[in-house]
Design a protein with these regions (language model features):
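The conserved Walker
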Residues: 350-351
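N-terminal pre-Walker A segment at the start of P-loop NTPase domains
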Residues: 318-338
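Conserved ATP-binding subdomain of kinase catalytic cores across diverse folds
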Residues: 24-228, 233-306, 310
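Hydrophobic positions on the alpha1 helix immediately C-terminal to the Walker A/P-loop
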Residues: 358
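Conserved substrate/cofactor phosphate-moiety recognition/catalytic segment
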Residues: 363-422
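Conserved lysine of the Walker
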Residues: 355
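Single conserved hydrophobic/aromatic residue that forms the stacking wall/gate
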Residues: 54, 440-454
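Hydrophobic anchor at the beta1->P-loop junction of P-loop NTPases
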Residues: 347
Length: 454
């Protein structure tokens, strides 16, 4: 078995699509029968609108259906071979132990085999099978999903985004017009299903115009990258080496070459839609702590509305009367104002007094973003947020100059987060008078019309 498929076969696009589909469907059915007869337990088959998946005791084989839809074209064997190779590539970035290789099936549709002579009939992505109960949506429904798993997933995605390939301004990805067009098309398709979403369409158009400079800056700053594209809870899983994501979008690069905050917004929105805002805020806190991407908060509400609209559209395409679709539509409307109005909470106390623990509980309770002075201090010096630092005050990263730079960084974050309209908790000692200047706080209150508490 090879990691990548054999050279693409001659293009069979001239073969009628219905004939390709019937042959592939017969091949999958024959494999299921052969493998089930070879031993227990019987091989299961799962079907989606674009795939067949055969589940053996330890592995999964994912076949692309010969279909041509508005958003993908699997209408030839060459196209399906390419899609399998892309699925392997994009998913190995996050789950290398889960995505094993691409296998080619030879023989005939009535007697297919992985090994053998003759032309290739179909390709499949071979994966390691995992328990359904390991997936986030199932774990959440069963009451088994832990906060530490959510936070570990957020940190994993932050690392993934930091390592992902960066889009260039010469590419179409992330351009303000492209971002607006993607959201507009999603809402138009949602409206075509009969959903009442005129208010969402109007809000999104206004937001797109307002955010155009922000989206342009994000592209210039390297925040548009090759992400995952589909980070809802059914695509998140707890494996032996920790939580990660699978089933990234392989068929449309425009859906995964996106702003990293837009990518992560899917996780947050899906928790919110399921009534677990507390987990969404804990996930966002962990992501921001790992990434330092507070600038992404400016467009996050727009991203959340878009992600909720995507899930509402998918649900309505499956069932126009879906209660799930109504839930996502309600979530989209709520996300327009989520995390506001802006407010500022300053934690005060000695190091080790429990401020961070209190702040962590508070942010999940009131729906707020948190910035930690110690984490930002470490970030300025290239130290991991979770790494222990043992330098004395006045030495290492705790010199007077380092402290001044840290205060400047905190001030920058505070202004940016409040300007974006979010509630913010500043987790720092605030023991020095200049760190909690009433004059400065009054200025912030006046400029951003915020509530304020210590």
């Amino acid at each position: 078995m090879a990691d990548l498929p054999a050279p693409p076969p001659p293009d069979d696009a001239a073969v009628p699509l219905a004939q390709q589909y019937a042959r592939a469907e017969r091949l999958v059915a024959q494999l299921q029968a052969q493998w089930s007869a070879a031993g227990a337990p019987p091989v299961e088959r799962i079907e989606t609108h674009i795939s067949w998946v055969l589940l053996t005791a330890t592995e999964a084989y994912k076949f692309k259906k010969p279909v041509q839809l508005g958003f993908l074209d699997f209408g030839s064997l060459a196209a399906r071979a390419h899609a399998c190779a892309e699925e392997l590539r994009v998913n190995r970035r996050l789950a290398p132990g889960l995505y094993l290789d691409v296998v080619a099936f030879h023989g005939t549709a009535d007697a297919p085999a992985i090994e053998g002579a003759g032309p290739v009939l179909e390709y499949a992505v071979r994966m390691r099978r995992f328990a359904p109960e390991a997936v986030f949506d199932r774990r959440l429904a069963l009451g088994q999903l832990r906060v530490d798993e959510v936070e570990a997933l957020a940190r994993r995605i932050a690392r993934f985004h930091a390592e992902a390939e960066v889009a260039t301004p010469a590419q179409p990805w992330g351009q303000p017009a492209t971002v607006a067009a993607t959201v507009r098309a999603t809402l138009a398709r949602l409206a075509d299903t009969g959903a009442d979403c005129a208010d969402l369409i109007a809000w999104a158009e206004q937001a797109a115009q307002r955010l155009a400079p922000h989206h342009a800056a994000r592209l210039r700053d390297g925040r548009v990258r090759e992400g995952h594209g589909d980070l809802h809870l059914a695509n998140l899983v707890v494996l032996d080496d920790g939580p990660t994501a699978f089933d990234a979008i392989e068929f449309d690069p425009g859906l995964r070459w996106i702003d990293v905050m837009n990518d992560f917004a899917f996780v947050l929105m899906d928790f919110m839609a399921r009534g677990r805002d507390d987990l969404a805020w804990r996930a966002l806190d962990a992501y921001l702590e790992a990434s330092g991407d507070f600038d992404g908060l400016t467009g996050l509400r727009y991203d959340l509305v878009y992600r909720a609209s995507v899930r509402a559209m998918v649900a309505r395409l499956r069932d126009p009367a879906s209660a799930e679709a109504l839930s996502y539509l309600a979530c989209a409307r709520r996300c327009q104002q989520i995390g506001g109005p802006p407010a500022l909470v300053l934690m005060r106390g000695w190091s080790g007094s429990g401020k961070s623990t209190l702040a962590q509980g508070l942010l999940a309770q009131i729906g707020a973003v948190r910035v930690r002075s110690d984490v930002e201090r470490k970030r300025l010096h290239g130290v991991d947020a979770l790494a222990a630092t043992r330098a004395e005050v006045g030495a290492g990263i705790y010199t007077a100059d380092a402290s001044a730079r840290t205060r400047a960084r905190l001030a920058e974050v505070v202004r940016g987060v409040l300007a974006a309209g979010w509630r913010l908790i500043v987790d720092a000692t605030h023991l020095r008078r200049d760190e909690r200047s009433e004059e400065h706080t009054s200025e912030l209150q006046s400029q951003f019309r915020i509530s304020y508490a210590v």
